[in-house]
A protein has these predicted regions:
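Tubulin/FtsZ superfamily GTPase core signature
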Residues: 1-259
Length: 259
């Protein structure tokens, strides 16, 4: 069981997607939510300083949270000012943070300052081993990867893509592949990105571009019929993977699962 925490209304919309699955316990925090067993009303203020002065005590609310916690935070949102204070209250947990980065070119004023501050501090948390991992999604890159995305369904499709990506990574961690082995990332490599893979040519569409990736893990899903009948498929895939950039500082691993 993994506990999912959404900090703020936007992040909680993503967290709500996990209700469709059985292996998660969901905690929603935002000004749109009423106090209940799994939701907490966060007060909204006009300036960031007020958030820092009014960090809620969530120890009772989160007392039954699992040891493995995945926290969703939306960059530039005023509610992200609560994030550091909330993370401090669950610091004994194994915390994975998923950060949704907005289009910073169009940010101005206070939202831009908030985004810069929270994004920078969370990276330092990851580098200091206070977080198990810090995974970044870019709204810009997600939009590029999605077809039929309109203004009306923009955020729902973005949220669905984030949910699907995280859920399947969680699934792969606990399900044995048909063949191959995903290497465990080194402790030092805590800042991550996720992307979509076209297995026809092994081309990637990253949902955030890391500057210097040190490890790349390929999770390959193939239907049962192809796995059973297509001879030479494994060699074909492995040969393409061997053409990927790799050296002593950049490792590549893979696994193949049945869909």
């Amino acid at each position: 069981m993994i506990s999912i925490i959404g900090i703020g209304n936007s992040a909680s919309r993503i967290a709500e997607k996990f209700k469709l699955q059985n292996n998660y316990e969901i905690y929603l925090l935002g000004s749109d939510y009423e106090n209940s067993k799994n939701s907490f009303n966060l007060k909204a203020f006009e300036n960031p300083e007020e958030y820092e002065k009014n960090i809620p005590n969530l120890k009772s609310f989160l007392k039954n949270a699992n040891q493995d916690v995945q926290v969703f935070i939306t960059g530039s949102s005023y509610s992200s000012n609560y994030a550091l204070g909330i993370l401090e209250q669950i610091k004994e947990k194994r915390i994975e943070v998923f950060y949704i980065k907005p289009d910073i070119d169009l940010l101005t004023g206070i939202p831009k300052l908030i985004e810069n501050a929270v994004y920078g501090v969370l990276q330092e948390y990851a580098r200091s081993s206070l977080l198990k991992s810090f995974t970044i999604f870019s709204n810009i890159e997600l939009e590029k990867s999605l077809s039929n995305i309109s203004i009306k369904n923009y955020f729902d499709m973005i949220n669905q893509a984030i949910f699907s990506s995280v859920h399947y990574i969680n699934f792969f961690k606990y399900a044995e592949p048909e063949i191959g082995q995903i290497s465990k990332p080194l402790e030092i490599n805590r800042i991550c990105s996720i992307g979509a893979l076209d297995i026809k040519n092994m081309s990637e569409k990253w949902f955030f571009e890391l500057d210097s990736p040190r490890e790349t893990c390929y999770y390959i899903c193939i239907n049962k019929d192809r796995l059973e009948k297509e001879s030479g498929l494994h060699k074909k895939l492995v040969d393409m993977l061997k053409e990927k950039p790799r050296n002593a500082f950049r490792k590549v691993s893979y696994g193949i699962w049945e869909t």
